[in-house]
């Protein structure tokens, strides 16, 4: 269950999005955060809430420095290119921020120094001599992505600050095993150097209380963070050996870690907005205003643990809610730029003439915000043709065309109680769904109103009535036009450009984007002139979709060829997306290994009675946390239809993060005798497929089914 948005209309709301990294192009994975956040902000404004919507480009950190060096330009030149790209792309998609800055803006440098100095003054920051990766051949220290090696927790290939290919854990300097320099490919060594640490360990009790009782948003974010806090927190190194970034106070040879100054950008961008609008940034960050962060699920740890601890330590307001999206797949394959499973917003979508609103609709309506979203060109075609064209577009166009041809204006009429009740119910459901960050539910409720409109139009047969009783026909069309007005308002947060066209076609002179939901119940004024309607949505034809599928297939083939070259020892430099050649080769090699044929061992046949002894059920994962002292085990709580959740221990930490499992339906062997693994009792087994070690995939039903359902 998601914790609802506050109903207090008196409090201003700040909505933010996780910052796009200014190191590569916008892809559909980015939009899983930005489009729902824009929908949410638009909807709040329609409810009459005071909303400020800010974001900006994340411009610091080693990936940007590494990529700039490869391209032979400065980091500043690189981030300017991509900052402009993201700004333009968001506007094309109808995502409009009140401020869109960069973390290299003076406001962010100043605010970061203010917060860091405040933490130093309150004794939350201390110096410590630690081991830092150093390359003797390059004669330089190697922070973050300048070094790779084995993750100390799961053994997978990892970067200096994160195990991105394995368990997903944040890594501190010096933790990486068998370090290798990504610049020259040679072995690195560890040398001692003074760095500065934030006393994150002192915030365990505060964070436990905050996450359990105060933080709203989506449960996947809270549960994931609570799992880490329960394990115990370690202090966090907040400095790096780089020239590019925000200087650490009093140390010209150090900058603050990117995950310090990046979230502080939320405050800096609010300051930029306030300076331009003549308003106050303190009402959010020092006052009672609400702060809602929309993020990708992969940065939950930073936003629910590091960030609120820093803010609390520096006496700033903490987030009211964190809304974490589910992951994105492409054509049922795990999203991977290296393997070609990616959809670029510009070259794959906008540049081919697809309307921005169609993609916004897909992202909002495909599934619940916290669940995994699969992008498929065929599914896009099906949804647009069956829903936007056949239902919403059909009702709006046939209503407006009939009214324009036969009346030219809004005819005389009264809003019927049945129609009014349907609109009121839709508004109620949409508002409730938005408050719970359930965008699919909101869209489904709005589409149900469009379906009602089609039924109303069809059942009253105005094409016959116009010949028999023009006045009675006018009454029907008046109500249809009123439904069209209501639908335009309700769908505006999701389809802003298309609904603006419909709004103007209805002769409405006000700004639909500034109009409130409540206007959906204000009677249309008879005599209002109607414009000749435009066809709002057109079918996506097979040949057009086939063309896009072929482009996608060619990309995967090219990636496979590159992967084969990498496996054969040829290293092709990567000039985009922040992935160095060493990393790209390793990821490609791992992907190739996963696709190799695995010999299948055939087991002896058994009688049906043997199979019948197995109590195999469908379970819903409620909670997941890593098992202490283990790199591979997860403690999982599963609802299998019993009075209390069943506790299992699953060896999946190397293949799934906690947030990827929570909410999923899985297959459980329920009558396996209890066993203790690393001191934790497991009362059953979560079933999975294993291809020999490279890939483990949990068995999951292809549709939701009641927990406890038997598998026979």
Swiss-Prot record:
This is Methionine--tRNA ligase. It catalyses: tRNA(Met) + L-methionine + ATP = L-methionyl-tRNA(Met) + AMP + diphosphate. A motif ('KMSKS' region) lies at residues 334-338. GO terms for molecular function: ATP binding; metal ion binding; methionine-tRNA ligase activity; tRNA binding. NCBIfam families: metG, metG_C_term, PRK00133.1. Belongs to the class-I aminoacyl-tRNA synthetase family. MetG type 1 subfamily. It is found in: Cytoplasm. Its EC number is 6.1.1.10. It comes from the Archaea. Keywords: Aminoacyl-tRNA synthetase, ATP-binding, Cytoplasm, Ligase, Metal-binding, Nucleotide-binding, Protein biosynthesis, RNA-binding, tRNA-binding, Zinc. InterPro entries: Anticodon_Met, Met-tRNA-synth_bsu_C, Met-tRNA_ligase_1, Met-tRNA_synth, Methionyl/Leucyl_tRNA_Synth, MetRS_core, MetRS_Zn, NA-bd_OB-fold. Gene3D superfamilies: HUPs, Isoleucyl-tRNA Synthetase, Domain 1, Methionyl-tRNA synthetase, Zn-domain, Nucleic acid-binding proteins. GO terms for cellular component: aminoacyl-tRNA synthetase multienzyme complex; cytosol. Signal peptide: none annotated. SUPFAM superfamilies: Anticodon-binding domain of a subclass of class I aminoacyl-tRNA synthetases, Methionyl-tRNA synthetase (MetRS), Zn-domain, Nucleic acid-binding proteins, Nucleotidylyl transferase. Is required not only for elongation of protein synthesis but also for the initiation of all mRNA translation through initiator tRNA(fMet) aminoacylation. One of its GO terms (biological process) is methionyl-tRNA aminoacylation. It comes from Methanosarcina acetivorans (strain ATCC 35395 / DSM 2834 / JCM 12185 / C2A).
């Amino acid at each position: 269950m998601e914790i609802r948005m506050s109903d207090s209309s008196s409090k201003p709301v700040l909505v933010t999005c996780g910052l796009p990294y200014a190191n590569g192009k916008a892809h559909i994975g980015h939009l899983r955060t930005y489009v729902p956040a824009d929908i949410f902000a638009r909807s709040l404004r329609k409810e009459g809430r005071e909303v400020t919507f800010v974001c900006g480009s994340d411009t610091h950190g080693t990936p940007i420095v590494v990529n700039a060096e490869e391209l032979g330009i400065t980091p500043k030149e690189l981030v300017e290119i991509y900052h402009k790209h993201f700004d333009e792309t968001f506007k094309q998609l109808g995502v409009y921020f009140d401020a869109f800055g960069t973390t290299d803006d003076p406001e962010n440098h100043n605010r970061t120094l203010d917060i860091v100095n405040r933490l130093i003054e309150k004794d939350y920051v201390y110096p410590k001599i630690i081991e830092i990766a150093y390359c003797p051949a390059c004669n330089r220290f190697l922070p973050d992505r300048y070094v790779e090696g084995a993750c100390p927790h799961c053994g997978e290939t990892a970067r200096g600050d994160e195990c991105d290919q394995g368990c997903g854990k944040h890594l501190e300097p010096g933790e990486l095993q068998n370090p290798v320099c990504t610049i020259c490919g040679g072995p690195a060594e560890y040398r001692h150097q003074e760095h500065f640490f934030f006393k994150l360990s002192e915030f365990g009790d505060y964070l436990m209380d905050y996450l359990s009782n105060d933080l709203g948003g989506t449960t996947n974010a809270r549960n994931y963070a609570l799992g880490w806090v329960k394990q115990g927190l370690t202090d966090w190194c907040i400095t790096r050996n780089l020239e590019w970034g925000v200087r650490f106070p009093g140390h010209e040879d150090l900058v603050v870690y990117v995950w310090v100054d990046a979230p502080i950008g939320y405050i800096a961008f609010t300051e930029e907005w306030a300076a331009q609008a003549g308003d106050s940034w303190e009402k959010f960050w020092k006052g009672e205003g609400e702060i809602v962060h929309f993020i990708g699920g992969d940065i939950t740890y930073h936003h629910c643990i590091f960030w609120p601890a820093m803010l609390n330590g520096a006496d700033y307001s903490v987030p009211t809610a964190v809304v974490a999206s589910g992951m994105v797949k492409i054509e049922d394959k795990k999203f991977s730029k290296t393997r070609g499973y990616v959809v670029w917003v510009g070259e794959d979508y906008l540049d081919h003439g697809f309307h921005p609103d169609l993609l916004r609709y897909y992202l909002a309506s495909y599934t619940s915000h916290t669940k995994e979203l699969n992008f498929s060109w065929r599914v896009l075609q099906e949804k647009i043709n069956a829903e936007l064209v056949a239902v919403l577009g059909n009702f709006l166009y046939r209503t407006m065309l009939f009214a324009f041809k036969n009346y030219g204006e809004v005819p005389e009429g009264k809003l019927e109680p049945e129609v009014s009740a349907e609109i009121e119910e839709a508004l109620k459901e949409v508002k409730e769904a938005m408050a719970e960050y359930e965008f699919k539910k909101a869209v489904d409720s709005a589409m149900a109103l469009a379906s009602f409109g089609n039924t109303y139009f069809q059942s009253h047969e105005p094409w016959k009535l116009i010949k028999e009783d023009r006045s009675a026909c006018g009454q029907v069309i008046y109500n249809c036009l009123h439904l069209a007005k209501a639908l335009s308002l309700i769908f505006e947060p999701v389809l802003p450009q298309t609904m603006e066209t419909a709004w103007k076609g209805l002769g409405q002179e006000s700004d639909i984007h500034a109009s409130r939901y409540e206007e959906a119940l204000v009677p249309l004024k008879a005599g209002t002139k109607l414009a000749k309607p435009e066809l709002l949505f057109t079918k996506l034809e097979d040949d057009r979709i086939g063309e896009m599928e072929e482009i996608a297939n060619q990309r995967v083939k090219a990636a496979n060829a590159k992967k084969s070259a990498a496996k054969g020892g040829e290293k092709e430099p990567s000039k985009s997306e922040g992935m160095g050649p060493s990393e790209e080769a390793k990821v490609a090699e791992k992907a190739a290994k996963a696709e190799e044929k695995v010999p299948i061992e055939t087991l002896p046949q058994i009688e049906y009675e043997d199979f019948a002894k197995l109590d195999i059920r469908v379970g819903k994962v409620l909670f997941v946390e890593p098992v202490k002292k283990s790199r591979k085990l997860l403690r999982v709580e599963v609802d299998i239809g019993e009075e209390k959740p069943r506790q299992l221990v699953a060896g999946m930490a190397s293949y799934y993060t906690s947030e990827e499992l929570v909410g999923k339906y899985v297959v459980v062997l329920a009558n396996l005798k209890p066993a203790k693994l690393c001191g934790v009792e497991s009362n059953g087994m979560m079933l999975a497929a294993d291809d020999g070690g490279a890939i483990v995939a949990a068995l999951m039903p292809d549709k939701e089914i009641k927990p406890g359902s038997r598998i026979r």
